[in-house]
Each structure stands twice: as structure tokens, then as C-alpha cells.
């Protein structure tokens, strides 16, 4: 499928999350054609994916190190740089790449298949839980606390608890007591 066809599909797609994931899949394909790695969806868009759109954000946050390649690809499909965001007026879409990589070499990612050979990578749920728990604890973000509890209730039996606890004790996170309390509260 050609780039213009994918852009038309994105424009016609009703689900905001599916539109975002299709855009990341297109970016992934274009970057891989340049022998570059796939970007990884992080932040609110990843939270929207795992919460099944209980939470929604209007922008796409990506972890990607090669800003030059990403900028070139975004420009080639009609995005314009506006401050820290790349904006596509026609698609009413905004992309930001606030992180150059995921936290740690062993950070898992979920690869989402979208059909027609399109796929995108999303931060692993354990790292997303830690990220949102940090926002809840350190920035006093109530919604992030609620979303962490929702994720633990929904995915608790499938989470990699040793990995989560290993990440939670790192000095930059310091969220082990919160993780253990949430685990207890949801009955795991």
C-alpha cells in the first residue's frame, strides 16, 4: 500500500486512536525504508491504547532518537513544525517526540498489527504504569493515578511484576510502595 493510500485511510478512519496508530504505522514504514528503527508510542496515546480509549489525548508522543530522520519523514507527508509539535492541518493531527529512547535497554514494547502489513510499537504496559505512577506521585496528577489503577485492575494478572518492582525501586522512580499498595488494593 502506498503512502497516499494510507493517508486517505487515516483521514477516513473514525476512531481517533486508530487514526493515531495508523499514522505511527506509516511513520514506521517510511523510517524502516530508510533503514531506521521504528518509533515507539509513549505517553497519553499509549495510555489510550491500553485503556481501550477510556483515556484520550489529541497528540501522539513518540520515543525516537534520530530526530533528523523523523523530521524528514514528517515533512515528506505534510506535517509542519510548530514549536515542539509537528502538525498536519489536513488530518488535524499533532506529533511530538519528547523522548529519544525508552527508559532502559530491557524496556519491552508491544507491536500492534494494523493489517495490510502496517504495524506500530507501543511502550510496554509496565513502563507505562511506572511513567503514569510517577506523574501521579510527583506531579500530583489525579487522572494518572486513576489510570494506573484501571490498568492494574485490567491487566494485573498479566503484568510482569518482578520487572515492575525492579523499575519501581530505581531512584528516578521511587514508586515501589505505591505499586505494592495498588497491587494489594486490587487483590493481586
Where are these regions (language model features)?
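Compositionally biased terminal segments of proteins
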Residues: 1-188
